Amino acid sequence: MFRARIRGIYATALTKLALDWGFKVVQPTPQIAERFGLRPDPSPPDVTVKDHESKTGVVAIGDCPAVDHLLERLREYADPVVAKASAGLHDVFVGRVVGEGLVEGPGGLMEVPGRYVLQPGAASVFTVVKPPVGPLRGVAVPEIVVDGKLLELNTTGRVAYSRHIGEEERLRLRILAETRLKAYASIGLRFKSSAKYAGEEELAREAEELYRELLRLSQGGPPGALLRRGRCLAVVLFDKRAKFKLDEARAAVVPTVRGHHALRGQGLGRCLDLLDHVGADVYERAAAFLARGRVAIYHVKPWGEVVKMRGEVVKALEDVLVVKRTLKPGGVLDGIGARIEPGTYALTCVPRSGGYVVHSYYSASGVYLGTYVNANTEPEWGRRVVYIDLLVDKAYGPDGVERVLDEEELQRYAHMLPERLRRPEAPGGKICTPEGLTSAPPRSSSA
């Protein structure tokens, strides 16, 4: 039985599902413990689940078998977008330095922070501190980091503490680091969040085990060798359909309205609790109400990268939002070729339904420059307009000639998408104007 620690805005739904799937939920929050009748269990988890920065998904990190089992069950239930890192957090490997600030590691080339002086061509022991996901390069350091359930032993020479350890427990652990664990602390020691539940003997025992492992790893190996597997990491993104499925799971435990998780991602607190309590089915109206004035558009890549675009809603129709965005001068418009001059702006049309968003571009004087259509999951309206990019785009200038972009990228990362999202299509012939979507190029715009 795998042990899972679950945090964040999806905690109730995912705890319900995890229990149904045979996981043991450990270190539950008081609210979760009360809802599920769970007894306190300070056991360290095999997998931790927490919010993704976009609030449109979660990050799962832990022992690889536990992470893989969780991903398998999530795919079966919610059919989400899943991007698993190609190397583990704290994988320890022998890497060869190539170029400036790069090392060959598991999952491809990895960046090395500039504070380390590297000799090109030299081979050394490295540890992955930021796993590579999709096209995002990982980060590795020429240090050894050995993960345990309670502690992390490393070669940094520093003592550190998880931010989830309070001052009282931190004082106890600091005294321990200066006494019984002093020899390990002089090498480099970090107390993980589960350490606050552990006794002195348990911590000392794990420190000794990690020290022996660190000595073994310090012997190195041939270039390219993976000396120790770290923890698996995966980004799991929920589109609107998947969030509705999680609403259903939560509703089996506590009163939950349709759209609960989408609205919670908008930052709603007590007012959402009230909607849950009275059973008000008002998701569409609530989302439209929130999508007023200044909004942030969260363009979320399948691997979890978030591109944030801020703008002002200039038109709110029943079926489409029109958002005006001022662009930073410099460079050219991708797929269109027009230069971004001072005053150039975009009108972004976000349909309530449909798998696309339309960005049309205008000069400072309102002359139409071209359009970029993004294929994505059905957008979620609100003070945050959220969608997951499906990697295929279409661009056309004033001449109307269409260019399909990024098809190779879709082929490369289609495995991250559920089958239902693997054949996206960016519609052509659509242009965003101050009045909404049209198919005719405007002569000028005065938004």
Swiss-Prot record:
Keywords: Endonuclease, Hydrolase, Nuclease, RNA-binding, rRNA processing
EC top class, as a word: hydrolase
Region of interest: Disordered: 424-447
Highest taxon of the lineage: Archaea
UniProt-listed Enzyme Commission number(s): 3.1.26.-
Keyword Translocase: no
Listed GO biological process terms: rRNA processing
UniProt cross-references to SUPFAM superfamilies, sorted A to Z: FomD-like
Gene3D superfamilies: FomD-like (2.40.380.10)
Pfam families for the chain: DUF402
Keyword rRNA processing: yes
Single GO MF annotation: mRNA 3'-UTR AU-rich region binding
InterPro entries per record: DUF402 (IPR007295), FomD-like_sf (IPR035930), Ntdp-like (IPR050212), RNA-bd_FAU-1 (IPR016730)
Role this protein plays: Probable RNase involved in rRNA stability through maturation and/or degradation of precursor rRNAs. Binds to RNA in loop regions with AU-rich sequences.
Recorded family membership: Belongs to the FAU-1 family.
Stated name of the protein: Probable ribonuclease FAU-1
Organism: Pyrobaculum neutrophilum (strain DSM 2338 / JCM 9278 / NBRC 100436 / V24Sta) (Thermoproteus neutrophilus)
Lineage, opening ranks: Archaea, Thermoproteota, Thermoprotei, Thermoproteales, Thermoproteaceae
Gene name as annotated: fau-1
